[in-house]
Design a protein with these regions (language model features):
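Short, surface-exposed, low-complexity cationic segments
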Residues: 38, 87-111
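Short, basic/low-complexity N-terminal boundary segments at the transition from targeting/disordered tails
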Residues: 44-64
Length: 350
């Protein structure tokens, strides 16, 4: 194993740290292709060693969800004009309570929404700047956080979940039309970034529930949300780009729709979703990104075995690490690589 190189962490911590560099028998990109297609991968990719990970705003120059604020709450305005408050304790942002919404009425979206500028020259410069940074590694996979999907953006512009869910019920046609136009915007945005930063995977965010149940019914999913989401996913995948779909909430009732949308990976809340039962039911048609939620060495190393055994038998599996302790993160990363190499070696040699 090489001494290690300093990489930039994007997520709940932005502290640079050293991670192992492994002498792999095939390229990171080839192994990822195999993982995405259940085609005999050799190890489990992880966010620290296999990916160049960026926030969308780094690549577009547009104000976007971010994790670079300090220890105090900070207000900020996103690319659509929504007002957010950075919450350091949560490691993320929430719509600012009492903030003025972009829209009071979703039926006004055609006249009142100001669509963000997709200036190609600005995006080109942002992508080139990102690729010039010392933490960017050409041999790694290009992976970025695309940002909010259909229902999250609807909620954001209307000022909250109550307003967003009421709009879905009271003005379904306007909501659907807005989400279709948002999808057209998203396709243009994706294509421009992909032109200047060939993209291996995006993370798409659309939270569909609380820890108790989904925000909306199967009928709303089928009539309003599914089609624009499917159009975007199909376009991204047609360009050879994988999708990691992050969706918070107890989304058991929506799993069939997620499988039909066919992202390579789902990133879901472990405490309210039984990933093992989903895997048992859908097999190779469903995949997962499982995040390490601890800096306890023994727990991280045990999880490196457990989740692979249960969820990654044939592929469609990777791990995200938001580490703040360099030594523990290093050891956990080594354990994941070494164990997964042994796991797949045994599987393919038997």
């Amino acid at each position: 194993m090489a001494e290690g190189a300093k990489y930039h962490l994007t997520g709940t911590t932005n502290k640079p740290m050293n991670v192992p560099v492994f002498d792999t028998p095939i390229s990171i990109r080839e192994n990822f292709r195999r993982m995405c297609t259940n085609d005999k991968p050799l190890w489990v990719p992880n966010s620290m060693t296999d990916f160049n990970y960026a926030m969308g705003g780094e690549l577009t120059g547009l104000s976007d969800i971010r994790f670079t604020f300090g220890p105090d709450p900070v207000d900020w305005v996103d690319l659509f004009g929504c007002i957010w408050e950075w919450e350091p304790a949560a490691g993320g942002s929430m719509l600012k309570p009492g903030g003025k919404p972009v829209l009071e009425d979703i039926t006004d979206w055609e006249t009142d929404i100001v669509w963000p500028s997709l200036d190609e020259e600005r995006i080109r410069k942002c992508c080139e700047l990102y690729q010039s940074q010392p933490y960017y590694q050409p041999s790694k996979l290009n992976y970025y956080d695309f940002g909010q999907g259909c229902t999250e953006r609807l909620v954001a512009i209307l000022g909250g979940y109550v307003e967003g869910m009421c709009a879905l019920l009271e003005e379904p046609e306007a909501c659907r039309d807005f989400m279709m136009e948002l999808t057209r915007f998203h396709i243009k945005l994706f294509d421009l970034v992909n032109k200047y930063l060939p993209t291996d995977m995006i993370m798409y965010h659309d939270d569909w529930g609380t820890e108790r149940d989904t925000f909306f019914s199967e009928n709303v999913m089928e009539e309003l949300v599914f089609e624009p989401t499917k159009i975007f996913f199909d376009h991204v995948k047609s360009q050879g780009t994988a999708i990691c779909f992050h969706s918070c909430g107890n989304n058991k009732r929506f799993i069939p729709y997620m499988v039909e949308l066919n992202p390579e990976y789902l990133q879901m809340q472990l405490r309210c979703n039984d990933l093992v039962s989903f895997k048992e039911k859908y097999g190779d048609d469903i995949g997962f990104d499982v995040t390490y939620h601890t800096n306890v060495r023994e727990v991280m190393e045990a999880e490196s075995h457990e989740y692979l055994n249960e969820l990654g038998q044939n592929g469609r599996f990777f791990r995200t690490i938001f580490g703040s302790n360099e030594e523990v993160t290093w050891d956990a990363t080594e354990e994941l690589y070494n164990y997964s190499r042994e796991f797949y070696d045994r599987k393919y040699s038997s």
